[in-house]
Amino acid sequence: MAEKPAQEQEQKRAMEPAVLDDIIRRLVEFRNTRPGSGKQVHLSEGEIRQLCAVSKEIFLQQPNLLELEAPIKICGDIHGQYSDLLRLFEYGGFPPEANYLFLGDYVDRGKQSLETICLLLAYKIKYPENFFLLRGNHESASINRIYGFYDECKRRFNVRLWKIFTDCFNCLPVAALIDDRILCMHGGISPELKSLDQIRNIARPMDIPESGLVCDLLWSDPSGDVGWGMNDRGVSYTFGADKVAEFLEKHDMDLICRAHQVVEDGYEFFAERQLVTVFSAPNYCGEFDNAGAMMSIDESLMCSFQILKPSEKKSPFL
């Protein structure tokens, strides 16, 4: 078998701690800049490639269904709203002050997808057993080719770098189980999901299929209707409160925690508090008045919420 190129071999090795710490320092220092200044964090293409290569190996070493323990903080969609990601860490504590699980959709729509994903990958490498990232439906080439990440990579670097991110995203895990009681994913449950071993056995790297279990985990939505229904997104299904209750009872769990939908208060319960949606990008896309939220789960599995309020609408003349 042909040897892998030396450059790729080199990148897969653990990053020098000093290099990693310097990347994190530059990314976090951004919080001292004036909001709306348009300033970007400068990372080299080589540094970003190494973040992708090293984190990808960690994702593949860890299971596709992460088994985690409380206490832990859970964050929903970020969508390139980098200043808001830093605000979440200011509220919850910068790693390793707290354990974190992010539910996907790091890129697209916002202005700083690159800073957002680079800081998250850097923390994953620095704290692999305390910091966890799931895959969202936007961590997919067919989606982020359209909704902004491809254009940001091309404008700031090149298309090659976007392809390297695609390879990394194809290795992200798709679900997490907290203390055997709380199941977390980006989208929701699937009519095909009969056993958690189905998630454990999904081979990676993989692209997100157009239908089936993985597609549903990343795309499905709760609905006021009963049973399984057609999803307005044109992908996957909707599921009623009856399906949530049925799933939790069958698997002896208490709660499903997911993201994927903008909710006004940053979090919203469904199915008599058996499912919660967490969305962490306030003033989403500058078009919504929503708050963002982070869910904290303590050792006794009590859930509480920290809220990022939407900013006041500023008059353009002030």
From Swiss-Prot:
Mn(2+) 1 binds at D77, H79, D105. SMART domains: PP2Ac (SM00156). Its cofactor is Mn(2+). It comes from the Eukaryota. It is found in: Nucleus; Cytoplasm. The keyword Membrane does not apply. CDD domains: MPP_PP1_PPKL. The active site is at H138 (proton donor). It catalyses: O-phospho-L-seryl-[protein] + H2O = L-seryl-[protein] + phosphate; O-phospho-L-threonyl-[protein] + H2O = L-threonyl-[protein] + phosphate. InterPro entries: Calcineurin-like_PHP_ApaH (IPR004843), Metallo-depent_PP-like (IPR029052), PP1_catalytic_subunit (IPR050341), Ser/Thr-sp_prot-phosphatase (IPR006186), STPPase_N (IPR031675). Its EC number is 3.1.3.16. Mn(2+) 2 binds at D105, N137, H186, H260. Binds 2 manganese ions per subunit. GO terms for molecular function: metal ion binding; protein serine/threonine phosphatase activity. Serine/threonine-protein phosphatase that possesses phosphatase activity toward para-nitrophenyl phosphate (pNPP) in vitro. Acts as a negative regulator of abscisic acid (ABA) signaling. In vitro, can dephosphorylate and inhibit the kinase activity of SRK2E/SNRK2.6, an activator of ABA signaling. This is Serine/threonine-protein phosphatase PP1 isozyme 1. It comes from Arabidopsis thaliana (Mouse-ear cress).
